[in-house]
């Protein structure tokens, strides 16, 4: 089959090709994702059985194929399934939009000085507002390139904002919601 993911930006990986117009991270195209998934199927790789994910190299080491980003806590995968999961009659499941394609951003961990300033304990995941804003910009850029409308799911799981529409991220999202083809 083919991945539902049209494009993936891993903000935490600095080793690959950056998305156009962005200064960090690695972008994965659908073609690259499908090639890696097919390679793993051909070699019998099962990422769940792999012990060390730190080198980001696929089990198909003779071709030195890079591994796709991993969803460490499963939150993004869970939300993607709700949004666009394929119908599974045996499990009585279907995502809200099973025929939808996905543009995915794996946010990077917030910088150490910010984690210390906000007293965020080690082991607790957090991200920076500017990285979220750039993630939204990336998703919109991909949708525009494809000429497709887009619905954005921002299931981050954390937000230090006032939740009153006054901070930068909230104002940015409000502005974008006024644009055509974005919801």
Regions found by a protein language model. Give the residues of each.
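Subunit-assembly interface segments of extracellular/virion macromolecular structures
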Residues: 137-141, 149, 153
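Substrate-binding/specificity loop regions of serine endopeptidase catalytic domains
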Residues: 157-183
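Extracytoplasmic/secreted envelope proteins and their assembly/folding machinery
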Residues: 80, 133-136, 170
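Conserved alpha-helical segments that form or flank metal/cofactor-binding pockets of metalloenzymes
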Residues: 50, 58, 66
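Subtilisin-like serine protease catalytic core
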Residues: 1-40, 64-130, 147-151, 161, ...
